[in-house]
From Swiss-Prot:
GO biological process, one term: translation
Composition-biased stretches (Basic and acidic residues): 35-52
Entry GO MF terms: structural constituent of ribosome
Protein name: Small ribosomal subunit protein bS21A
Length: 76
């Protein structure tokens, strides 16, 4: 990964690098590789992530169709 440093502005270059790494998912992968994850734990995590994605998609779809308001339930 490469970031240009313009006018010796290292802080701006570091922010750009961090943003690129965040977008690529490098921080998340480093966290996951920090310790061994058993295959059963990996399956459970991936299944939970899939359920979370499906719920989010259903919520967005319902919101688009006007069935649910965009505000969270606690704010009502």
């Amino acid at each position: 990964m490469q970031v240009l440093v313009r006018d010796n502005n290292v802080d701006q270059a570091l922010r750009a690098l961090k943003k690129k790494m965040q977008r690529e998912g490098i921080f998340r992968e480093m966290k996951m590789r920090g310790h061994y994850e058993k295959p059963s734990e990996k399956r459970a995590r991936e299944k939970a992530e899939a359920v979370r994605r499906a719920r989010k998609l259903a919520r967005k779809r319902a919101q688009r169709e006007g069935l649910v308001s965009g505000r969270p339930a606690a704010a009502r």
